[in-house]
């Protein structure tokens, strides 16, 4: 439990001459920054789902607590489907010869942009059911980035440093879990009696954050060239 999987051979074969890469280089690499930025936007949507989705259904749309109970399950069902689909599709694309830039970077970032655009449409539909559907689909698409970022980081990070790099990555992107609920609450409070308008403004902000995060992901996620850049440095690192 907790050890590197079967794709990592150097620990099992007794190879210990792994050259480390400085954390300043790893943490300022464009793919690391892209992973943090993209997942920051995805976690923004996730944290709002945990904190404000049910209140939106009950107080914003007028559903009963009983109905809210089963409606609140929908984002997690759809999100689980996206996670499984992304993992399967990424493996298929790589097996067919696509670079990890496309099979991981683009595949993880593009759904963030699509999801953000969907969220921007919520204020423009009148049906409560359509609002919920757009929110479920738009927020659920962000699940794609969680699947691809850890393996992308693993592509260019030396084996002995992967745990630390992935832990730092997680600590940074989850900061949005503190910011997003506060922003939504502030917007709703300032809306006064027009609570639904406050929710709509909050979801517009959510959509914009996801779009920016997705665009940054498309711009910065180049794990295959990141590895080549590190290997071209004088202090070469050894990769699994």
Regions found by a protein language model. Name each.
Residues 64, 103-106, 186-210:
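A membrane-interface helix-boundary motif in multi-pass transporters
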Residues 83, 156-192:
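A late C-terminal transmembrane helix in Major Facilitator Superfamily
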Residues 57-58, 89-90, 94, 185-194:
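Interfacial helix-cap and linker-helix signal at transmembrane-aqueous boundaries
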Residues 67, 103, 161-168, 198:
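Cytoplasmic loop-to-transmembrane helix junctions
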Residues 29-86, 146, 150, 177-185:
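Extracytoplasmic gate region of multi-pass secondary transporters
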Residues 118-123, 205-236, 240:
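Multi-pass alpha-helical transporter architecture, strongest
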Residues 101-149:
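C-terminal transmembrane helical hairpin of 12-TM major facilitator-type secondary transporters
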Residues 4-36, 60-63, 235-240:
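Juxtamembrane intracellular "pre-TM" segments in multi-pass secondary transporters
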């Amino acid at each position: 439990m907790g050890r590197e999987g079967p794709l990592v051979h150097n620990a099992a074969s007794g190879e210990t001459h792994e050259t480390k890469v400085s954390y300043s280089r790893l943490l300022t690499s464009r793919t690391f920054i892209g992973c943090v930025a993209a997942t920051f936007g995805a976690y923004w949507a996730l944290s709002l789902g945990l904190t404000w989705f049910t209140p939106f259904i009950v107080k914003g749309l007028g559903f009963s607590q009983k109905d809210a109970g089963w409606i609140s399950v929908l984002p997690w069902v759809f999100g689980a489907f996206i996670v499984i689909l992304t993992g399967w599709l990424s493996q298929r694309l790589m097996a067919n010869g696509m670079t990890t830039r496309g099979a991981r970077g683009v595949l993880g970032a593009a759904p963030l942009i699509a999801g953000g655009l969907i969220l921007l449409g919520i204020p423009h539909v009148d049906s409560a059911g359509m609002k919920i559907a757009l929110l479920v689909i738009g927020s659920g698409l962000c699940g794609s980035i969680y699947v691809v970022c850890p393996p992308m980081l693993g592509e260019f990070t030396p084996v002995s440093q992967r745990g630390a790099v992935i832990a730092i990555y997680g600590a940074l992107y989850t900061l949005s879990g503190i910011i997003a609920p506060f922003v939504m609450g502030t917007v709703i409070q300032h809306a006064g009696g027009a609570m639904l308008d406050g929710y709509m403004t909050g979801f517009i902000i959510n959509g914009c954050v996801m779009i920016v995060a997705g665009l940054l992901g498309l711009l910065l996620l180049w794990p295959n060239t990141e590895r080549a850049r590190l290997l071209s440095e004088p202090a070469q690192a050894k990769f699994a």
